[in-house]
A protein has these predicted regions:
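N-terminal amphipathic alpha-helix/helix-capping segment at the start of soluble metabolic enzymes
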Residues: 1-25
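Conserved, mostly hydrophobic/aromatic
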Residues: 22, 48, 52, 98, ...
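Glycine-rich, proline-tolerant flexible connector loops at the mouths of alpha/beta enzymes
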Residues: 28-30, 55-80
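Glycine-enriched alpha-helix->loop->beta-strand junction motifs that scaffold or abut catalytic
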Residues: 107-115
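Conserved small/polar residues in nucleotide/adenosyl-binding loops
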Residues: 132-134
Length: 134
């Protein structure tokens, strides 16, 4: 796993870092970030990287208000193929997994993600333990 800490610091040129968001959900808060199949996921990630994204964030569960939670199995079946496909086409880009679940974070990290974006701020009691071991 690459050391992404320098990339996460402020850029020397003063410009902000850019995160490209790829949601593999049918009900994402941002409709334009939704990707419905692996080919579209890869096309979207490659385009974002070519347009200047510093990293790609992959999410498999909508965080929009009123969204129904998905099972761990459904989330995994959405994000793992996406992460693996992005990693195969963009081997040097940083990939984050957007999840609130430690099980998904662990599988994603094992499948090529580099960091975790947890909007629940580690509310899953296992998340911190999972992150300590990476």
């Amino acid at each position: 796993m690459a050391d992404w800490r320098p990339m996460l610091k402020r850029r020397e040129d003063g410009f902000p870092r850019i995160m490209g968001i790829v949601n593999v959900t049918p009900d994402s808060f941002h409709a334009s970030s939704r990707s419905s199949n692996i080919e579209h996921v890869v096309e979207t990630a490659v385009r974002m990287a070519s347009e200047g994204a510093d990293w790609i964030d992959v999410g498999g569960e909508s965080t929009r208000p009123g969204a129904s939670p998905v099972t761990i199995e459904d989330e995994l079946s959405r994000v793992i193929p996406a992460i693996e496909a992005i990693r195969s086409q963009l081997p040097n880009i940083c990939i984050s997994i957007d999840t609130r679940r430690s099980e998904v974070a662990e599988e994603a990290l094992d499948s090529g993600a580099d960091m975790v974006n947890d909007v629940s701020a580690l509310s899953d009691s296992g998340m911190l333990l999972s992150l300590i071991h990476i």
